[in-house]
UniProtKB/Swiss-Prot annotation:
Domain-level remarks: Comprises two domains: an N-terminal domain containing the nucleotidyltransferase activity and a C-terminal HD domain associated with both phosphodiesterase and phosphatase activities.
HAMAP family, alphabetized: CCA_bact_type1 (MF_01261), CCA_bact_type2 (MF_01262)
Protein's name in the database: Multifunctional CCA protein
UniProt keyword Translocase present: no
Cofactor info, note text: Magnesium is required for nucleotidyltransferase activity. Nickel for phosphatase activity.
Residues reported in the UniProt entry to bind Mg(2+): 21, 23
Additional record remark: A single active site specifically recognizes both ATP and CTP and is responsible for their addition.
Organism ancestry: Bacteria, Pseudomonadati, Pseudomonadota, Gammaproteobacteria, Alteromonadales
GO molecular function: ATP binding; CCA tRNA nucleotidyltransferase activity; cyclic-nucleotide phosphodiesterase activity; magnesium ion binding; phosphatase activity; tRNA binding
Binding sites annotated in the UniProt record for ATP: 8, 11, 91, 137, 140
One Pfam short name: HD
Length: 405
């Protein structure tokens, strides 16, 4: 029975990146052997065990044979005869197909170290094509390691396109797609994930509402980058600078989906795209089973980003009604996130990246002023029923007006 550190832990150790999770592979052991040593079995599809002390994952060395469609369509062999090299052969990329023994020796049968040095993401074997999830995983790795200078090998891009053309991507579960997408959104260069998927044709399979934005023009005066798809990627890139939150980055990504529904004869104008975007955002979120907090912020962002962009032109009453519609009184943190996403939108344009965006502070200040209005004082003044709400609105508008002035 031999134990090896494998996969991402070895890769990141060699890259001198922090190692977050350690995965181990066990060669020459059976399920009974692992249970006898006190390990707890947790894997449903194949035998994975938790170490009794560290709770790290230990998997029996295995081979895989494709027998069906999608991510789960595999038959596994975890017999004691499976070698380490056979286990590494089934992995996705050469940089993930290395192992380390107890003495720190690297076992690298597929030249993963060479690809690490050359900053290349390359598939291990043609079996790569058997698992459609790998298209998303490689796109995620491309997003994670872009800042290290990594790029995807041309032959691997070809296999990713082949998988897309085969129709296999549609057999993935929504949950799997969202997990990979959410992880990618939290990387330092999340736009690379979506650009990679678009390059191999995969974006239109799961993100059709986003994919259709490329080629749709915006007015050059406000969008020197012109293309709505490019703008969406620039906004996502800027969202990394303003927030670590998944909901903010997702809202930044999908804020302009309404422009995909603008009649071409109206281009490059997109009047009304804000509310038009609500349907495609809901459709996308239902398809991917996006968490409610991400969906809700994305819907607010779509409907109201133009309000924030035109903040200095809005009347006090309009600002107050906008605050009401955003439910800021009960959800101020979400409203703050909306303003962050709007900041990313404003800066996600060619030549606007470093320009100040005072609109967000202006709207936040209006909220703080309106928040100071004391409803108890209105009640104590003798107002009742609908009068209370009316007085509260008037006093808030008056408070906001001091900021507008």
């Amino acid at each position: 029975m031999q134990v090896y550190l494998v996969g991402g832990a070895v890769r990141d150790k060699l890259l001198e990146r922090p190692v977050k999770d350690k995965d181990w592979v066990v060669v020459g052991a059976s399920e009974a052997d692992m249970l006898a040593k006190g390990f707890q079995q947790v894997g449903k599809d194949f035998p994975v065990f938790l170490h009794p002390k560290t709770q790290q994952e230990y998997a029996l060395a295995r081979t895989e044979r494709k027998i069906g469609q999608g991510y789960a369509g595999f038959e596994c062999d975890t017999s004691t005869n499976v070698t380490l090299e056979q286990d590494l052969l089934r992995r996705d990329l050469t940089v993930n197909a290395m192992a380390m023994d107890d003495n720190g020796n690297i076992i690298d049968p597929f030249n993963g170290q060479k690809d690490l040095r050359n900053r290349v993401l390359r598939h291990v074997s043609d079996a790569f094509e058997e698992d459609p999830l790998r298209v998303l995983r490689v796109a995620r790795f491309a997003a994670r390691y872009a800042s290290y200078g990594f790029s995807i090998a041309d032959e691997t891009k070809t296999l990713m396109a082949n998988i897309t053309q085969s129709g296999e991507l549609s057999h993935l579960s929504a949950e799997r797609v969202w997990v990979e997408t959410a992880k990618s959104l939290l990387e330092d260069t999340p736009q690379i994930y979506f650009e990679t998927l678009r390059e191999c044709g995969a974006l239109k399979v799961w993100f059709a509402e986003l994919d259709c934005l490329w080629g749709i023009p915006n007015p050059a005066k406000w969008h020197p980058e012109i293309d709505t798809g490019i703008h969406s990627m620039m906004v996502l890139e800027q969202s990394v600078r303003v927030s670590h939150k998944l909901s903010v980055r997702f809202a930044a990504l999908v804020h302009d989906l309404g422009k995909g529904l603008t009649p071409p004869e109206e281009w490059p104008s997109h009047r009304g795209h804000e509310k038009r975007g609500l349907v495609p955002i809901n459709t996308l979120c239902e398809r991917l089973k996006v968490p409610n907090d991400c969906r809700d912020l994305a819907l607010l962002m779509s409907e109201f980003h133009s309000h924030v962009h035109h903040a200095f032109k809005l009347k006090a009453a309009t600002i107050n009604d906008f605050l009401d519609k955003c439910d800021v009184w009960r959800k101020p943190e979400r409203f703050a996130d909306l303003l962050l996403a709007c900041t990313a939108d404003a800066k996600g344009r060619t030549g606007f990246e470093e320009r100040p965006y005072p609109n967000a502070d202006y709207i936040w200040q209006a909220y703080l002023l309106a928040k100071e209005v004391n409803v108890q004082e209105i009640v104590q003044a003798g107002y009742k029923g609908a009068e209370i709400k009316q007085q509260l609105r008037q006093k808030r508008i008056h408070a906001i007006a001091t900021n507008v002035a």
